[in-house]
Amino acid sequence: DTRYPATLLNGVALRILAEREVSRGRAAILKAYYTKLAESTGHEHPDIPEEVLQVSLNPDATNVPYLLGRLFSVLEAVQAAANPGINATIRDKYFSGASATPAAVFPVLVNLAQKHLKKLNAANRGLSIAYEKQMTELLSKLGTEYPAHLNLPQQGSFQLGYYFQTQARYQKKEEK
């Protein structure tokens, strides 16, 4: 029942930031790290929110880094829907900054998303409304201010929130 070394979390987080991709394997390593840490500390650790220990998207989550990751995924989906076939997405340009310094990046991304929603509304009003509803729900849970910085464990929560929200979107597409 020993913890995984912090270098494991650091290494995975750096790979995610460098490649801007949270793969299934990386998400599994993040979850394993947090699960072991929770077991060794008796779930009484400030950097282990309950959402991180879940096996799928937790729509009732209140953990700010997790919610920010979910919001980033929705913003990425809005951009992709408004600009099909785009070469560089917000993930390519903003993922690292959004997961480390949300206060500097998210106001820009939300502003961009409003423009994307306007464009999408002209092409597909129903999809535009659905994305706007998701954004509004997440933004209301986040409150009025974004955190200036996220530490490494919080970045892991962000990355898992992003991963689970993205996977939930793909599952919905497969069910249709």
Place the predicted regions along the sequence by residue:
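Intrinsic-disorder/low-complexity detector
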Residues: 1-176
